[in-house]
């Protein structure tokens, strides 16, 4: 699939619930993406909807949040389908990352640009899951906290169809 990832990512980040998006599709059969939710916007939405959560990891794993993100992606896909040159860029699968992409973890530059090559390596297991028939994937990664300490994050990540 020939596509411009930044174009899709910027369309997705237009939604207040999506803080960051990373799209994949180069030399793949279809386009997929990682989504980072905006904890403040989605947290406020969750409170209004009565969806309880204990933090980012918990909120990002909620089915209601996945549906909210799916609605945003569906709107982007509808726009893409209106342009014949962009029909091949329709997003078919996505996942909500259990952690925020962070410059301290080398996933973003200090100016918040996605470091694609690093993400392709660090999140290979999740990218592979997007292009397989599984509907979830166990994931573990190192994280750096604001005070410089490091830790580990384990999560079962849902793979969702658009």
How does the language model describe each region?
Residues 20-22, 29, 76-162:
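Conserved C-terminal "lid"/linker of ANL adenylate-forming enzymes
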Residues 1-85:
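AMP-binding/adenylate-forming catalytic core of the ANL superfamily
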